[in-house]
């Protein structure tokens, strides 16, 4: 048997946010967290690679490590591409939010027009 009070709370919660703004806020915060994490990861990888490259140059151990360094730099570039994709997601969110009010107003106007048309035909 299901507890009716918990079911009504769940229904009320879903009804409180029919447009999913709370979920969008959480998703936006998570995206910012992922971007921050990627930036920190790239920073650490870059610092490590630069230190290793400096050691290679100082110690003259170039032959065996060039391929490893190239592979690590490729990984770093892939992370940069992923970061760029996250920023593109943010740009898309900005575009959506910039036009949100206009789209809502247009939807309300369309609804009102349909409502007036339906009442005239009665």
Curated annotation (Swiss-Prot):
<dbReference type="InterPro" id="IPR034455">
    <property type="entry name" value="CNL1"/>
</dbReference>
<comment type="subunit">
    <text>Component of the biogenesis of lysosome-related organelles complex-1 (BLOC-1) composed of at least BLI1, BLS1, CNL1, KXD1, SNN1 and VAB2.</text>
</comment>
<comment type="function">
    <text>Component of the biogenesis of lysosome-related organelles complex-1 (BLOC-1), a complex that is involved in endosomal cargo sorting.</text>
</comment>
<comment type="similarity">
    <text>Belongs to the BLOC1S4 family.</text>
</comment>
<feature type="compositionally biased region" description="Basic and acidic residues">
    <location>
        <begin position="1"/>
        <end position="10"/>
    </location>
</feature>
<keyword id="KW-0963">Cytoplasm</keyword>
<dbReference type="GO" id="GO:0031083">
    <property type="term" value="C:BLOC-1 complex"/>
</dbReference>
<feature type="region of interest" description="Disordered">
    <location>
        <begin position="1"/>
        <end position="21"/>
    </location>
</feature>
<dbReference type="GO" id="GO:0005737">
    <property type="term" value="C:cytoplasm"/>
</dbReference>
<keyword id="KW-0175">Coiled coil</keyword>
<dbReference type="GO" id="GO:0007032">
    <property type="term" value="P:endosome organization"/>
</dbReference>
<protein>
    <recommendedName>
        <fullName>Biogenesis of lysosome-related organelles complex 1 subunit CNL1</fullName>
    </recommendedName>
</protein>
<keyword id="KW-0813">Transport</keyword>
<feature type="coiled-coil region">
    <location>
        <begin position="63"/>
        <end position="95"/>
    </location>
</feature>
């Amino acid at each position: 048997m299901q507890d009716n009070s918990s079911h009504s709370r769940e229904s009320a919660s879903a009804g409180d946010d029919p447009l999913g703004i709370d979920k969008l806020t959480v998703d936006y915060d998570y995206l910012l967290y992922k971007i921050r994490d990627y930036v920190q990861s790239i920073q650490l990888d870059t610092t490590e690679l630069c230190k290793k490259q400096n050691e290679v140059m100082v110690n003259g151990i170039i032959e065996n490590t060039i391929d490893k360094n190239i592979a690590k730099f490729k990984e770093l570039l892939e992370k940069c591409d992923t970061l760029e994709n996250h920023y593109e997601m943010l740009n898309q969110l900005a575009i959506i939010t910039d036009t949100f009010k206009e789209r809502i107003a247009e939807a309300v106007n369309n609804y009102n027009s349909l409502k007036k048309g339906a009442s005239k035909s009665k």
